[in-house]
Amino acid sequence: APHTRVLRGGQVRRVPTREIVPGDWIVLGEGERVAADAVLRQAQSLTVDESLLTGESVPVRKRPSDAALAAAAAGPPGGDDLPQVYAGTLVTTGHGLAEVSATGGGTQVGRIGASLAAIEPAATPLQRSLRQLVRLFGTLALAGSGLLVLWHGLRGGDWVQGLLAGIALGMAMLPEEFPMALTVFLALGSWRLARMQVLARHPAVVEALGAVTVLCVDKTGTLTENRMALRRLVTPEADVTAQAGAPLPEPVHRLLEYAMLASRRGSTDPMDRALLTHGDQALNDTEHLHPDWRLEQEYALTPELLAMSQAWLDECGQRRVAAKGAPEAVIELCHLPPTSAADILAQVRRLADAGLRVLAVAEGSAAGAAPATDQHDYDFRFLGLVGFEDPLRASVPAAVAQARGAGIAVAMITGDHAATALAIARQAGIDTAAGALTGEQIAALDDAALAEAVRRVRVFARVLPEQKLRLVEALQSHGETVAMTGDGVNDAPALKAAHVGIAMGARGTDVAREAADLVLLDEDFSRIVGGVRMGRRIFDNLRKVMRYIVAIHVPIAGLALLPVLLGLPPLMLPAHVVLTEMVIDPICSLAFEGAPEDPRLMQRPPRHAREGLVGWPMLLQGVVQGGSVLLPTLLAYLLALRAGQHADVARTLAVVGLMAGNLLLVAVNLSAGLGWRALAAPGARPFWVVAVIA
């Protein structure tokens, strides 16, 4: 069981996390998970990764508070310099002491989990279609069987034969292949998705993917790689875009050198790690790496000065000082004149508008044998700016373009700043013409106004967890079929409410995975678009098999009904119906699952949410196809009887004709829209097996 350090009786003890209660004081250290919602009472350079709750990978600063516990514990997660820490979040730097305000179901995580019980997941289009089909065919079968029994019994008085005829007709009219075909298609679809690193928790959702009209995606970790990478280095002499593994020009070497010297080796801070990783590669063959220098003094970042410095002794014993931090703080350390400061801050804004997180770097010096007691005691010289980004996944632009080509609107929902969200959206190819709608603006809109706004806007920034759910519901109010991705506890309500909830596998929380329908094992956005392709293919092939099933039931039902109405010996006995429907039809239906996809599959717009699996035009096609088999088969039966053949011989002739017609119906429906090449596909092997046996 997990344990937590707790201050009790003036001593720090490790106790099981489940034994923590409100009022306990918990000790927080770098790399540790926070055990409960709490309010910071003491802290030193404490930053916390709250992506579990906010979806944003950049850690936030924490500041202790002496305010009343109840008032201090009221704020939402996210934002710098707040005193609250939350259960499940990760301490990335520093240490602290916090007073527990809530445990278990009373925490932010617990409340989000409890809210899932109140959300009813929407039925998939396939489920709605099947309910309609079951009602239609069930009603027809019951009515037809009952009328046939009454007609036969009242007309001839032979109630036993009438009952057998009614049973045969009911069996012929009830398409029991529907559930078999559906189960096989969805099971094999789930298997194919699993081979694409997409785990389907609910098989019915495989088909629903093909009906998606709006794909709502989180930025961090879905469109991006969920890591900080060094992207820009700006000095007075140069402005360089950094690329992993690529050499850097000499004018930015010193900037990167001192940015590394101001970073802690072994730190969990993502920007420190990005600087050190990139610098170790880019400066490997230069004199700007200093493994032999000794760290003399570290000056931690404080709420009053958002910059940190490290003093080093080089191989000659000379002190070298490096500082990095918020540009405003480093400008203050360098005592720059207002004009220079204004120029630097203008450059910072340009970098921020490009979606970068910006730090400033400075080089310091001081007289004296001992290191200074405060960062302000050094004479700093401004070196430049370093910009970081969470890199866009390489496969995303092509996948977004493919989704938009298929008529699917891609919307980004993130907790990040609007400028960053818009920059990433532009790189990904998401529509940014309407700008970004922020969480603050969403909160000011009523449901009707929000429903109107989501028609145009495709980028949503600074969004709170409960607002993600509102956005999904607003889209659904227009009849959109919504897919939603997420990984944090905060995403769970929206994942459950969406028609297709997609959780991240590697970094997703258990709560998010439980609420989702699909789990993206390798977190590659392009897999979602591949899943949409798979869903559309399954729906197309399901339509083909449903039309075939309707078509084959026309001659089966007709051959069971018409001879009785004409006063002839029964043609289709229950045994014949069982043989036809339970053996031949299912085997032929399997051929449809492996049918190749339409080459224009991803150029078509999504089908309408209310479009059923089998519409009246398709039913009519099936009836016409079935009638073309029924008429010659019935005619052969009548001619055989008129020629004086025994009823068994005539019946055998008709059943053989029905089997041949069945194969013809399979071939016609299998090749619909694809040409006869569909019969050569590997998935058509069951058809050829049955054809050879027949």
What are the roles of these predicted feature ranges?
Residues 1-7, 106-118, 154, 161-162, ...:
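Juxtamembrane helix-loop transition segments at the membrane interface in multi-pass membrane proteins
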Residues 1-4, 105, 116-196, 205, ...:
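Hydrophobic alpha-helical segments characteristic of transmembrane helices
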Residues 2-128, 247-250, 256, 444-454, ...:
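Cytosolic catalytic regions of P-type ion-transporting ATPases
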Residues 8, 125-135, 166-170, 201-211, ...:
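Membrane-interface segments at loop-to-transmembrane junctions
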Residues 47, 54, 64-66, 70, ...:
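Basic, amphipathic juxtamembrane/active-site segments
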Residues 84-92, 211-382, 388, 401-402, ...:
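Cytosolic catalytic regions of ATP/NTP-dependent phosphoryl-transfer enzymes
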Residues 129, 155-168, 178-181, 198-209, ...:
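Membrane-water interface of transmembrane alpha-helices in multipass transporters/channels
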Residues 148, 186, 432-484, 498-677:
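Membrane-embedded transport module
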